[in-house]
Amino acid sequence: ILDSIATSGEEILYCGDDSAGELGDILHYCFQKWHELSSDELLPEGKKSELFELFLTHFAEGCLKEFDWWWDWIQMAIQLADDEEKQGRIIQELDKVINIKGDEWGINYNRQVAQRHKLEIMSKRGTPEEQFKFMYENVSNPDFRRRLLQMAWDRGDYKEVLRLAVDGA
């Protein structure tokens, strides 16, 4: 039922009258239930894998891409990605978003969100040095710049703090 509602969600929102917010509330409720399911540690392995595939497929196919719910798909897949193979598949999907060319607001927003999720996956499987390098390579991401500023401040590298701050201004 949850899947049927969510996969029809875009059509429902585009074609229906959601001026009272009720259609969006239904989708929000579905995602709330999915988040609960994906965080359930007692969920059988078979169900976890099934949900992982469902979530990653919906993300890859762009289900609800015009809405922030699209990012819920990948968040839940990340929560269920308990091995390197699954984590690698998520990174592949995130890289597709990161590598989209363009300077439009939506492209930049999606790129930054995808970079944050990729860093989250890297924290599960990569080294701190790899994460640090990734943040520096993507220092235009405001979240990464803030983290790098804080890290430089914490280690007393005020020259680097100044450089990062000036470059970001």
Per-range role (PLM):
Residues 1-169:
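Eukaryote-biased, non-catalytic alpha-solenoid scaffold regions
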